[in-house]
């Protein structure tokens, strides 16, 4: 998608800098004049939303780190100090807490959009793999951040999740001891998690830069899945795509503000407002909502090692999706059978999320096993089979042809009026 630069320095300073460090030219080419397909919809705005929320999380996290004390006897009190004594500390903390939830909601929506429109297919395999790596890094960062308040759910969540490594034969127990910094979760564990929680967002920034670089090499996908064939198929990123992203961000910020100011603890857990007590186990240990589907997969397998393999396998299988899907058609808009199974997969992920919040008793483990089998069957059986047997609809000749065809059809309102 890259071509000859259209940037023209307008001042002497810009011309001087352009001959020595053409950073303004690079920003102009990548974020102003960059060509994007003219038919992208609001589903493509989640990338911009993710970029903004990554910045919000880093800035709010750095400010919180100035007042947080990574010591097991003071961590909980330091959080209360932030809430009560630091100017606008309550606001910064609630922004950081709910920002994490919105960050994950956006990344899941971004991933589902990529699966629906085939954004993982050739030549965008590396782009997709980098995206999956970002999700894995986000989960690690979020888990470590969940431990820092040192409440009941923080302490016992850290105990349960880190204990999973003990399932690894021969080396599992030494790994757990190394993670804990001793023989139980304590102050060394907290300081290690605090250090890594501060570091990993900047690692995510680095991978995001590679992700954006890969995107700008291969170009943006679009709802038809047809590649750009001429300049008629594209528009400039600024102002066209930027305006669409701004509208989506505005709607997102309205919802975000509602959570921050009116229901800031709705997505959290009440037990985390109780100081950590190694002698009292919570009745029901659960992670944050955005990790619940994988927690359900973990608990679906009775064997401890099998559960760990299944949980990590649920992420690893995403890395191989570009090669599991053999269909020549990218977009689900032209794949009727794939579209049905895609929405069943989305429903299964939501189902697993609900099961992850339920106690591991009664019928819930059995339902988790059903949901887990369907999750892996989607990638390992259904998607490869559809690539061979599905008969897709005819593709448009170009993006421009698809846009003209869509505009030639009467709108829903017009069809209702003409009845």
Curated annotation (Swiss-Prot):
One of its GO terms (biological process) is respiratory electron transport chain. It is found in: Membrane. It is a multi-pass membrane protein. Its cofactor is heme b. Its main location: membrane. The keyword Acetylation does not apply. Heme b b566 binds at residues 110, 211. Binds 2 heme b groups non-covalently. Gene3D superfamilies: Cytochrome Bc1 Complex, Chain C. Pfam families: Cytochrom_B_C (PF00032), Cytochrome_B (PF00033). Heme b b562 binds at residues 96, 197. The chain crosses the membrane at residues 46-66, 89-109, 126-146, 160-180, 199-219, 247-267, 305-325, 340-360, 370-390. Heme 1 (or BL or b562) is low-potential and absorbs at about 562 nm, and heme 2 (or BH or b566) is high-potential and absorbs at about 566 nm. PANTHER family: CYTOCHROME B. Component of the ubiquinol-cytochrome c reductase complex (complex III or cytochrome b-c1 complex), which is a respiratory chain that generates an electrochemical potential coupled to ATP synthesis. This is Cytochrome b. It comes from Blastochloris viridis.
